[in-house]
Swiss-Prot record:
Listed EC numbers: 7.1.1.-
Signal peptide boundaries: none
Family: Belongs to the complex I subunit 2 family.
GO molecular function terms listed in the Swiss-Prot or TrEMBL record: NADH dehydrogenase (ubiquinone) activity; NADH:ubiquinone reductase (non-electrogenic) activity; quinone binding
Keywords for this protein: Cell inner membrane, Cell membrane, Membrane, NAD, Quinone, Translocase, Transmembrane, Transmembrane helix, Transport, Ubiquinone
Assembly and interaction partners: NDH-1 is composed of 14 different subunits. Subunits NuoA, H, J, K, L, M, N constitute the membrane sector of the complex.
Reactions catalysed, as given in the entry: a quinone + NADH + 5 H(+)(in) = a quinol + NAD(+) + 4 H(+)(out)
GO terms under biological process: ATP synthesis coupled electron transport
Upper lineage: Bacteria, Pseudomonadati, Acidobacteriota, Terriglobia, Terriglobales
Class in the EC hierarchy, top level: translocase
Localization of this protein: Cell inner membrane
Name listed for the protein in its UniProt record: NADH-quinone oxidoreductase subunit N 1
PANTHER family registered for this protein in UniProt: NADH DEHYDROGENASE
Pfam families: Proton_antipo_M
């Protein structure tokens, strides 16, 4: 990607967002035209097509010059394009899983696919925003969509309850984020992310800016399910449809992490001595609370909800590195976690059904005997979540912890390694159940034949996780390209004043170990 500020084709800089918007509108228009009990699966395939086009448009954006559009509000660079591809891919696979999960006569599922598309628009806007107000707009678009998706099963007792809890706590976190933007504007006179960094060098209201940054971090910590702002996560995951949980647990987190990286490294690098200790504490709490909480769970979705809290902590470990390696490690881990989590929820969605007939770890006994394919895929994703070599999870954790160690965060890396050991126990508990013969008195586990949509979703997630574990170089190279986005002007100027950033030419690079 060539550096520049060309705005010759502004629409190309938001082409994936346009495609998802059109997809959502078309799905909403077509949905009422279907007979009451007709299958809405064609609308799901339409969403898959939209996600494919958005994915292709995102890859096309790699050929655009670095620059902004619409008066500096939208920014296209290697970092934003990397997360565009990730989020579009997550929506693609989630739509395939949903097509498999919904019953042919299920009503109103057209709205479910439309909400996926509209939520993707908000997440994509967050990742390419160069303006805090656009981040807020994208955050609200994605949040409203996920609130509704979380409570989409209206006949479920837990669905509406979890959605209301998610909405109330989410609104509270959004208020923190918005108030943080207001305080930042009061301290710097701007809400443009690159301009904030320059304004802080001459600002006389730095304490106000510190408070503003703290509020922004609190709002984003809620969105990524980081402790102690994680209380909504287990209930929301348990009450939402399983295909939706695969989307909820990955895409909004990826978007929020992208925003967190951009704000911390591009807008507030001079405050690294404030936000690094804060993120250190949040990372340690998230890993510990998430893994210890998962040990106590018998419900599979609640167990994976606590697991997602722990993985948010692993991602935050990379944030504290203050180096291109840390940013690249966080970006790589986001891809790895997305592939693993969407894949495992695809299996859970098919086994448990749209209505979650089977929810407990014991219910999965005999899965490998009833369906060797689903049992094998479940085992593969569990091993990857543990971090077994030749899986994406191994390299993801290796890059995160090595970045922390190289930056001197040795104790945080040790805490992460200890928590990775704790996680082995609850992942193996589900793995053991999958390959155990059920007792005669147990509920007979029945699984329907996987549909083409599910097989395609499983192939994409398994292949991605496997390739990331064997050939991580290409994805890591793209992640490093995005990381160096933050080391271009004007951040080089900030680096000379604050001593925060190293010269990209002399920065250490992550090297792949031999598994």
């Amino acid at each position: 990607m060539i550096q520049g500020m060309t705005d010759t084709y502004p629409l190309l800089r938001i082409l994936p967002e346009i495609i998802f918007t059109i997809t959502g509108v078309v799905v909403m228009v077509l949905e009422p035209l279907f007979p009451k009990h007709a299958s809405r699966k064609p609308l799901g395939w339409l969403t898959v097509l939209g996600a494919l086009l958005a994915l292709a448009a995102s890859f096309y954006q790699y050929g655009l010059p670095i620059g902004t559009a619409y008066f500096g509000v939208v920014q296209t660079d290697a970092f934003s394009v990397f997360f565009h591809i990730l989020i579009s891919g997550i929506v693609l696979v989630s739509a395939l899983v949903t097509i498999d999960a919904i019953k042919p006569d299920t009503e109103n599922t057209g709205e479910l696919f439309a909400l996926m598309a509209f939520g993707a628009v908000g997440m994509l806007l967050m990742t390419c925003a160069a303006e805090l107000l656009l981040v807020f707009i994208g955050l609200e678009i994605s949040s409203i969509a996920t609130y509704i998706l979380a409570g989409f099963r209206r006949r479920s007792a837990k669905g509406p309850e979890s959605a209301i809890k998610y909405f109330l706590l989410g609104s509270f976190a959004t208020a923190f984020f918005l108030y943080g933007i207001a305080l930042t504007y009061g301290a710097t006179g701007t809400t443009n992310i690159p301009d904030i960094a320059a304004a802080l060098l001459t600002s006389h209201a730095l304490p106000l800016a510190v408070v503003g940054l703290s509020f922004i971090l609190i709002g984003l910590a809620f969105k990524v399910s980081a402790a102690p702002f994680h209380l909504w996560t287990p209930d929301a995951y348990e009450g939402a449809p399983s295909p939706v949980v695969g989307l909820m647990s990955t895409a909004p987190k990826a978007a929020a992490f992208a925003v967190l990286l951009r704000i911390a490294y591009e807008a507030f690098p001079v405050f690294h001595f404030h936000w690094v200790p804060l993120l250190w504490i949040i990372a340690a709490l998230s890993m510990t609370i998430g893994n210890l909480g998962a040990l106590r769970q018998r419900n599979v979705k609640r167990m994976l909800a606590y697991s997602s809290i722990a993985h948010a902590g692993y991602l935050l470990v990379a944030f504290t590195a203050l180096s291109p390696d840390g940013i690249a490690a966080a970006s790589f881990y986001a891809v790895t976690y997305a592939a693993m989590n969407v894949g495992i929820f695809a299996v859970i969605s098919h086994v448990g059904g749209y209505d979650d007939r089977l929810t407990l770890v014991e219910d999965y006994k005999g899965l490998a005997y009833r369906s060797p394919l689903l049992g094998g895929v479940m085992a593969f994703f569990l091993l990857s979540l543990i971090g077994i070599p030749f899986t994406g999870g191994f390299f993801g954790k290796f890059y995160v912890f090595s970045a922390a160690i190289h930056s001197g965060m040795i104790w945080l890396a040790i805490i992460g390694l200890i928590n990775s050991g704790i996680a082995v126990f609850y992942y193996l508990r589900l793995l053991t159940a999958t390959y155990s013969k059920p007792a005669e008195s147990a509920l007979v586990l029945t699984t329907g034949r996987p549909s083409f949509a599910l097989l395609l979703a499983l192939f994409l997630t398994v292949a991605t996780t496997l390739l990331l574990g064997i050939f991580p170089g290409s994805v890591l190279a793209r992640a490093q390209e995005g990381a160096y986005t933050f080391y271009r002007a004007p951040l080089v100027i900030l680096g000379t004043h604050a001593g925060v950033f190293a010269d990209p030419a002399t920065a250490k690079s992550i090297t792949s170990p031999t598994p």
